[in-house]
Structure formats: structure tokens, C-alpha cells
């Protein structure tokens, strides 16, 4: 749409979007989705890498799939948020705040935007993403009297990452920028 300077209701664009969901790679990926809305194993779905719900949603977004145009994608997005999002908006590989890292939070927030998925819960996800980078309103990792704190994966502001020897992570920074 953007490359061709088309309006959202352009008939040719609408036809192309419909065809995206009924043929090609989008249809192939959707054919492997379980009826409950996940790929691979149930749950937060980071693993099996490149075959689980995380990777399927990212790929669908990059291929131009649209949650408004296909109820299966909306189902998968809802399933994912229900299993991977914590009470403070962290997107987690396991559903626990300790399994949150910038790269995954950024990739998934960007994927939801790419998929045109609109849900009030995403406000918390983007809020956590911004706060966790700046440190605003987020307690240090050792603080145990609040859940709005850094954990072992996302250990501090400025893209600090437990998987990157507690250093800033360029991979995570790029994914966060994609989301914003």
C-alpha cells in the first residue's frame, strides 16, 4: 500500500491482501497453526526456534498478513498475549518477567504493529518497553518489593542484557527501535 501510494480501501489492494491469506507462505504458515491459536507447543512459545508462535507471528507480520483480515491471526495474537505477557507488560519467553529481553519484546511489539493487531493490552507492552530502556519507574534488579523491576534477562536500562554479559545489546536496541 505504501509503496504503491494506495488508499486502504483500494480494490486492487484489498484483493492482494485477501490473496495473501489464501495462498503462498502466509497460508502455509497458517495451515500449521493449532486450532487454539499457537504453533508448536502450547504456551508462551519461544521454542522451538523458528517454528513456534513467536517466530510465526513475526514472519506473518513481515509477509504482510493482517489481523483485521483474518480471524486466525487475531486468535494467535490474543493467544500469545494471554500466555507471554506479564502483569506489567513484559513479553516473556516463558510468561515470567525473568524471561524478558529487549530483542524479543521489540520483535513482538513490532510484529503486532506489522500485523495491524489492535489490543488495549499492547499499551502496557509498549509502556514497559519504553520504561525498561530509560529506567523511568523501574526498580533495580535486586529490589524484591515490586514487580515493576528489572529481572535476570532484562537487567537494567540502556539495553543491558543478562544474555550479553550484562552489557548493552545492539541486537536488542535495533529490535526496540523497530517497534518504536
Predicted features along the sequence, with ranges:
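Preference for long, amphipathic alpha-helical scaffolds in soluble/luminal domains
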Residues: 1-180
Amino acid at each position: 500500500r505504501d509503496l504503491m501510494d494506495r488508499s486502504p480501501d483500494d480494490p486492487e489492494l484489498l484483493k492482494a491482501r485477501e490473496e495473501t491469506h489464501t495462498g503462498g507462505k502466509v497460508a502455509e504458515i497458517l495451515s500449521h497453526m493449532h486450532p487454539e491459536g499457537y504453533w508448536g507447543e502450547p504456551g508462551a512459545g519461544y521454542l522451538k526456534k523458528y517454528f513456534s508462535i513467536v517466530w510465526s507471528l513475526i514472519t506473518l507480520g513481515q509477509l504482510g498478513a493482517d489481523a483485521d483480515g483474518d480471524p486466525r491471526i487475531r486468535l494467535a495474537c490474543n493467544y500469545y498475549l494471554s500466555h507471554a505477557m506479564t502483569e506489567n507488560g513484559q513479553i516473556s519467553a516463558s510468561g515470567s518477567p525473568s524471561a524478558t529481553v529487549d530483542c524479543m519484546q521489540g520483535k513482538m511489539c513490532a510484529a503486532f504493529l506489522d500485523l495491524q493487531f489492535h489490543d488495549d493490552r499492547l499499551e502496557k507492552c509498549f509502556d514497559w518497553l519504553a520504561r525498561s530502556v530509560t529506567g523511568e519507574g523501574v526498580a533495580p534488579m535486586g529490589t524484591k518489593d515490586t514487580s515493576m523491576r528489572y529481572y535476570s534477562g532484562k537487567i537494567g536500562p540502556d539495553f543491558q542484557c543478562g544474555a550479553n554479559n550484562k552489557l548493552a545489546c545492539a541486537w536488542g536496541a535495533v529490535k526496540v527501535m523497530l517497534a518504536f
